[in-house]
């Protein structure tokens, strides 16, 4: 299990602002209707980007954390299995969704997020990750 500490990045306002600006710059290559993020550290980056781009922010949360009807996807982690969910009314048919997360490792969580968008009727416009653990190959998937 590999964890990366993002607190040093987000506590430095200049570094955090530059990170958000770089995400926005990359996101402008795509047609985006909504921005989704994976709980919880993806929320830090995606909420700022959503605010600045004036796009709806969709939370992809751990199992049983959302109050309304949800779609669910189970996926494998390095240390077991997990489930992420999205509200059924969050993504509409043919919505183009940018998925943002703090990190990509094996790609399992990103793949599950893409399945949630697909199940909801949307399409993944792109993924943007702040950190890529190249040795684990997730960005190749």
Language-model features: where?
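PRPP-associated nucleotide enzymes
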Residues: 1-141
């Amino acid at each position: 299990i590999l964890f990366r500490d993002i607190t040093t990045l987000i506590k430095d306002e200049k570094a955090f602002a530059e990170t958000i600006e770089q995400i926005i710059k990359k996101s402008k290559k795509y047609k985006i209707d909504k921005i989704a993020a994976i709980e919880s550290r993806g929320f830090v980056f995606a909420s700022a980007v959503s605010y600045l781009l004036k796009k709806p922010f969709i939370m992809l949360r751990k199992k049983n954390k959302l109050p309304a009807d949800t779609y669910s996807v189970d996926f494998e982690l390095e240390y077991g299995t997990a489930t992420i969910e999205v509200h059924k009314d969050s993504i509409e048919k043919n919505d183009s969704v940018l998925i943002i997360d703090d990190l990509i490792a094996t790609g399992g969580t990103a793949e599950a997020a893409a399945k949630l968008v697909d199940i909801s009727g949307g399409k993944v416009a792109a993924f943007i990750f702040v950190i890529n653990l190249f040795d684990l190959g997730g960005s190749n998937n």
